[in-house]
Amino acid sequence: MTDRLNIHRLTTETRNPQTASIHQADTMEILRIINQEDFKVAEAVQQVLPDIQIAVQFAHQSLRRNGRLIYAGAGTSGRLGVLDAVECPPTYSVSPDTVIGLMAGGADAFLQAAEGIEDSEETGALDLKTIGLTAEDTVIAIAASGRTPYAAGALKYAKTIGAKTVALTCNKHSLISTYADHSIEVVVGPEVITGSTRMKAATAHKMILNMISTAVMIKSGKVYENLMVDVHVSNEKLKERAIGIIQSITGVPYDKAKETLEAAGSHVKTAIVMLKTNSDETHAKALLKEAEGFIDKAIEQHVSKEKER
């Protein structure tokens, strides 16, 4: 058996001595055991914050160059990437191809497990070719084991193109880490149910992906204070949220916030700058464009220009 296939040496495949008798536990004890193990996940993530920071830097630079952040994974790992990617457009008003989640087997595999499809390195490379991977992109391959061929193939191909690459795994010295510019190896220990990496490993990866995409969007001016000022106003709930955001930042009454949001074409940042600078939509948009989308910079520029008059 090759070293690559000897999964029994992986931390994620070893037995957890704390859960060896879980089959004999009552319901509350089962839940307590799982909860106790889950506490270890956040601590493990804390240990790799410096590595996550580098991944954020890669992705942020890609977006500044009009590149993309691309997740690639199989099974649960692939689903996590898709989940993070699809939430970015409504939350931050980025286009659907700014953050992309690629999953072995495509959309069908998201709903129904297709375990065998992960064994093809060629498929990982092909999926990146299909979306036209460029050197401006950042690819984060996700695999709890650190040895999934689909993830390995994606990283190998991305390296040939010149894209920045990151391996996200739950095992030290993993195979896919050797194919990446940088790795995040978050060791959460053995699973509650041996080898069930949809549990602690997946939880850790979900936390890390949340951190990466959120930090990138903050650094891209999509957040002001702690508010999602680039929220895409696509339904009544989000419209009410947008009005609340405008009120919170500017202090205007509900009706004024609603009126300004409508005048700004439902663009929250424009409405905020309009109110903060007492300007119209055209001027507010020009200020935001000059400030690369950052509200505070747009307001500062306006104040500076007013002083020069």
UniProtKB/Swiss-Prot annotation:
PROSITE patterns: GCKR, SIS. Its EC number is 4.2.1.126. The keyword Nucleotide-binding does not apply. CDD domains: SIS_Etherase (cd05007). Keywords: Carbohydrate metabolism, Lyase. It comes from the Bacteria. InterPro entries: Etherase_MurQ, Glucokinase_regulatory_CS, MURQ/GCKR, SIS_dom, SIS_dom_sf. Gene3D superfamilies: 1.10.8.1080, Glucose-6-phosphate isomerase like protein, domain 1. It is an enzyme of class 4 (lyase). Pathway: Amino-sugar metabolism; N-acetylmuramate degradation. Pfam families: GKRP-like_C, GKRP_SIS_N. GO terms for biological process: amino sugar catabolic process; N-acetylmuramic acid catabolic process; peptidoglycan turnover. GO terms for molecular function: carbohydrate derivative binding; carbon-oxygen lyase activity; ether hydrolase activity. Residues 59-222 form the SIS domain. It catalyses: N-acetyl-D-muramate 6-phosphate + H2O = N-acetyl-D-glucosamine 6-phosphate + (R)-lactate. The active site is at E87 (proton donor), E118. Specifically catalyzes the cleavage of the D-lactyl ether substituent of MurNAc 6-phosphate, producing GlcNAc 6-phosphate and D-lactate. A lyase-type mechanism (elimination/hydration) is suggested for the cleavage of the lactyl ether bond of MurNAc 6-phosphate, with the formation of an alpha,beta-unsaturated aldehyde intermediate with (E)-stereochemistry, followed by the syn addition of water to give product. Belongs to the GCKR-like family. MurNAc-6-P etherase subfamily. PANTHER family: GLUCOKINASE REGULATORY PROTEIN (PTHR10088:SF4). Homodimer. This is N-acetylmuramic acid 6-phosphate etherase.
